[in-house]
Design a protein with these regions (language model features):
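Alpha-helical support elements that line or immediately flank enzyme active sites
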Residues: 1-9
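Polybasic low-complexity intrinsically disordered regions
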Residues: 6-7, 15-19, 28-175, 184, ...
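Helix-centered, glycine/charged polyanion-binding patches within enzymatic domains
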Residues: 147, 153-156, 161-239
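Composition- and surface-driven signal marking solvent-exposed, interaction-prone regions
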Residues: 126-127, 169, 228-232, 254-259
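Residues within the helices of the helix-turn-helix
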Residues: 12
Length: 259
């Protein structure tokens, strides 16, 4: 399933690639004479992963392994959310319509993501319907001792900026990390406005790194839209993409190569 995510393959093309490509066989541990799975095996595997919640277990295992090897360095955390189109407007009853500022409304789900600041590797991910507030799963995606937490300034379907409220900042402080979020306004003299603008610019300059993760997952790992129906399978797809993106990015890091 990771190979399918890395190469954006359907079940049929993945089965064909496993049968024909020696590199795919070696990666999956198949000998040259062994039969490889048919496409129906991937359908059953996904069903088992979703039913037993093993997609979360696998994602957490990857995160722990990278932390143990020193690839993920706790120098701060970036949090944000991105909207992903549903597989079908007509048949996906769990996905919802959501608009974002002046953009065209989208029928889909939201991936709420936390990454480390230094390497921008994904440390936490949750999937909700598109109408859920961007910071609704903040407590679930934030790691313990996250350091400075940089929140996005994207406005959610609920209206206000997602990470600038008292409740979300309380969640961040409870985890031991000071919030570094974009502020929407201030009272006082012009000097106060200048300080506010400088603060927001500094936060955006760091927070924008998480956009590269969203872009990579959508461009290279099949998250331009959901492949399967339902929120549970959407969560599986997003976690597979998160693992694929994190593993591929981790091998290019200088300290990972040194280790």
């Amino acid at each position: 399933l990771l190979l399918a995510t890395w190469h954006d393959l359907s079940d049929v093309t993945l089965a064909e690639a496993l049968d024909e490509r020696a590199s795919f066989r070696r990666f999956c541990g198949f000998a040259a004479h062994e039969p490889t799975p048919e496409r129906t095996a991937f359908v059953r595997s996904r069903r088992e992963l979703v039913t037993r919640g093993l997609d979360r277990v696998r994602f957490d295992a990857v995160t722990r392994q990278l932390e143990a090897k020193g690839v993920m360095v706790r120098t701060g955390t970036l949090v944000d959310a991105t909207l992903i189109r549903s597989a079908s407007i007509r048949h996906d009853g769990e996905a919802k319509w959501a608009g974002h500022r002046r953009r065209k409304p989208t029928h889909g789900d939201t991936a709420q993501v936390a990454t480390d600041r230094a390497a921008v590797l994904i440390r936490g991910v949750e999937v909700t319907t598109a109408t859920v507030h961007d910071a609704a799963e903040l407590e679930a995606v934030l790691p313990s001792q996250p350091g400075d937490v940089y929140g996005g300034d994207r406005r959610s379907a609920a209206g206000p900026s997602a990470f600038a409220g008292r409740s979300t900042e309380a969640v961040i402080r409870a985890r031991g990390g000071p919030p570094q979020v974009v502020r929407s306004g201030t009272w006082g003299r012009p000097e106060a406005l200048v300080r506010l603008q400088a603060h927001n610019a500094a936060v955006r300059r760091i927070r924008c790194r998480i956009e590269t993760v969203f872009g990579t997952c959508k461009r290279c790992h099949g998250l331009r839209r959901m492949r399967w129906l339902g929120l549970a399978k959407a969560g599986l797809q997003v976690r597979l993409a998160a693992m694929a993106c994190t593993l591929r990015r981790s091998v290019t890091l200088p300290h990972a190569a040194a280790a």
